[in-house]
UniProtKB/Swiss-Prot annotation:
The keyword Nucleotide-binding applies. It catalyses: L-arginyl-[protein] + ATP = N(omega)-phospho-L-arginyl-[protein] + ADP + H(+). This is Protein-arginine kinase. The lineage of its organism: Bacteria, Bacillati, Bacillota, Bacilli, Bacillales. A motif (RDXXRA motif of the pArg binding pocket involved in allosteric regulation) lies at residues 337-342. It comes from the Bacteria. It is an enzyme of class 2 (transferase). GO terms for cellular component: extracellular space. Its EC number is 2.7.14.1. Appears to be allosterically activated by the binding of pArg-containing polypeptides to the pArg-binding pocket localized in the C-terminal domain of McsB. The gene is mcsB. It holds the Pfam family ATP-gua_Ptrans. Belongs to the ATP:guanido phosphotransferase family. The keyword Transferase applies.
Length: 354
């Protein structure tokens, strides 16, 4: 695997999957926060300590195969251009926080299912991404990588508290589980605000597509646990999965209600959005996301035939500003980005129909 391949293949293999409940759940993510006993926290460490952690991973983990993930590549943030960092964020392989660090790095698997972020808020953050509702499977993979790393380093661990992390909400298991979910039915029936309030009362967090502080573009929301202390990994996963399954049922009921009461209006909305995507010469990110959401809903409900439902996930990534500029070979102005976004969407839809 090379940096060029990572940059030029915008669609990660996990995005092409068709996991359980993938008509509503786009992806499942597990993240484990860990710190090393011998180093100060990332928020307090100096340049030399940050470099030592990079060198440790370069020595112990590069060009070593871990089945079934293949080999890993180390990407140092200070060796990447700002555009390359942005592409990694838009592909969900690193956090915006890591992209802004000078001595951060990412250990990335061939399949891009696994990324280990170094020198972010914690010394390492192990991330596993799976398509559909596969939290248990993602946790199993994360634990496998966690055990692999722990053979070479000693973690900061307290017998009574668990794993010690920079942020108090991560102390304990250090586990953050999240699900990316497409909820156009609940948005259209204006039930989403009530659902979010209920979710938050259960101790869960609702965010946009790129995590904290991001917007819920295209009716896509991230739902995750908040506290990790006092619960086992299995309990955290079970609680989140139970809530997600209830949200799935609420979304299905909302879709059925719209079809029963406003079928022709919904079909019109879907085909109008399809027409915009198939014919526009200029389209901004927000409009593209909303139209792609309508198109995906139309595919799921059977209004649109012959187009893969994965098109929402693929084009939501492909049409992000960083990836558009990466394909163009350099910076683009806003109007040029809108032009290239519209062109890419038209061509992608044309390929699907043929």
């Amino acid at each position: 695997m090379s940096l060029d391949k990572i940059m030029n293949e915008a669609i990660s293999p996990w995005m092409k999957g068709d996991g359980p409940d993938s008509d509503i759940v786009l992806s499942s993510r597990i993240r484990l926060a860990r710190n090393f006993k011998k180093y100060q926290f990332s928020t307090m460490q100096n340049e030399e300590e940050a470099k030592q952690i990079q060198e440790l991973f370069k020595k112990e983990f590069i060009n070593k195969t871990v089945e079934p993930f293949g080999e890993f590549e180390l990407l140092k943030m200070n060796e990447l251009t700002p555009l390359q960092r942005r592409v990694l964020v838009e592909k969900h392989l690193i956090s915006p926080n890591l992209a802004g660090t000078e001595y951060g790095a990412c250990l990335l698997s061939e399949s891009e299912h696994i990324s280990v972020m170094l020198n972010e808020e914690d010394h390492i953050r192990i991330q596993c991404l799976f398509s559909g509702l596969q939290l248990s499977e993602a946790l199993q993979s994360a634990n496998q990588i966690d055990n692999w790393i722990e053979k070479e380093v000693e973690y900061a661990f307290d017998e009574s508290l668990g794993y010690i992390t920079s942020c108090p909400t991560n102390v304990g298991t250090g586990l953050r589980a999240s699900v990316m979910i497409h909820l156009p039915g609940l948005v259209l029936t204006k039930r989403i605000s009530r659902i979010i309030q209920v979710i938050q009362k259960l101790g869960l967090v609702v965010r946009g597509i790129y995590g904290e502080g991001s917007e819920a573009l295209g009716n896509i929301f991230q739902v995750s646990n908040q506290m990790t202390l006092g619960k086992s990994e299995e309990d955290i996963i079970a609680d989140l999965k139970s809530v997600i399954q209830q949200i799935i049922q609420q979304e299905k009921m909302a879709r059925e209600l719209i079809v029963q009461n406003s079928s022709i209006e919904l079909e019109d909305k879907v085909y109008r959005s399809y027409g915009i995507l198939a014919n526009s010469r200029l389209i901004q990110s927000a409009e593209a996301a909303n139209c792609l959401s309508d198109l995906r809903l139309g595919i799921d409900l059977g209004y649109i035939q012959g187009i893969s439902r994965n098109i929402l996930t693929e084009l939501m990534v492909l049409t992000q500003p960083g990836i558009l500029q990466q394909y163009a070979g350099g910076p683009l102005g806003p109007e040029e980005r809108d032009y290239r976004r519209a062109t890419l969407i038209r061509e992608r839809l044309r390929i699907e129909k043929n």
